[in-house]
């Protein structure tokens, strides 16, 4: 760093289907590339997992980390206007949730979002229905959403819990993502990007 508030700040959220994972996973994530290529400062929150605490614990923990970054730009050496959010799998879903929360609460003007193969939809889409992948599949997906949303009334799942339910994505930051065509999250990722583009957001 050459001075205070001079590099990109990245809130990077680990994956694990909302039920597993740890903040140290950041060391094997795409966030490492952002550090190497751009000298970014990365904050990786250790959010509460759904096995212990269901929604909204994880989303609020990650949002709190975002607010921490905003309030500590000088100590972190990051630019207030260059805070981005990213994550993989459930971390990608939480990335989208945090972007919605920041917009609605008018708290942080997030510069960019990078939800990679994000877990966005608690309802089966074409790619998550009858998926028999080894790492993640329909059965694991159902269990994870059941644990994450327990206590949330059926039919009243908020967009902060499952961002695919968001009716309005206007005002969200530009986005970059990727997803494999055999992954359970393939269709919901495409739908999210299509929704952003329809709202005039570069994605």
Region spans (language model):
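Alpha/beta-hydrolase superfamily serine-hydrolase fold, recognizing
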Residues: 2-203
């Amino acid at each position: 760093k050459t001075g205070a508030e001079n590099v990109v700040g990245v809130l990077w959220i680990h994956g694990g289907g909302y039920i597993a994972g740890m903040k140290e996973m950041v060391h094997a994530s795409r966030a490492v590339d952002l550090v190497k290529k751009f000298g970014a400062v990365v904050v990786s929150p250790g959010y509460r997992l759904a096995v212990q605490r269901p929604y909204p614990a994880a989303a609020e923990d990650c949002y709190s980390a975002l607010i921490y970054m905003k309030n500590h730009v000088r100590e972190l050496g990051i630019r207030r206007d260059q805070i981005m959010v990213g994550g993989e799998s459930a971390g990608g879903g939480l990335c989208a949730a945090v972007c919605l929360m920041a917009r609605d609460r008018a708290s942080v003007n997030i510069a960019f979002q990078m939800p990679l193969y994000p877990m966005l939809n608690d309802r089966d889409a074409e790619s998550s229905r009858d998926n028999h992948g080894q790492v993640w599949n329909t059965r694991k997906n159902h269990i994870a959403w059941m644990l994450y949303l327990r206590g949330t009334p059926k039919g009243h799942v908020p967009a902060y819990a499952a961002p695919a339910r968001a009716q309005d994505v206007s005002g969200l930051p530009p986005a970059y993502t990727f997803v494999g065509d055999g992954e359970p999250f393939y269709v919901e990722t495409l739908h999210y990007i299509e929704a952003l583009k329809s709202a005039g957001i570069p994605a």
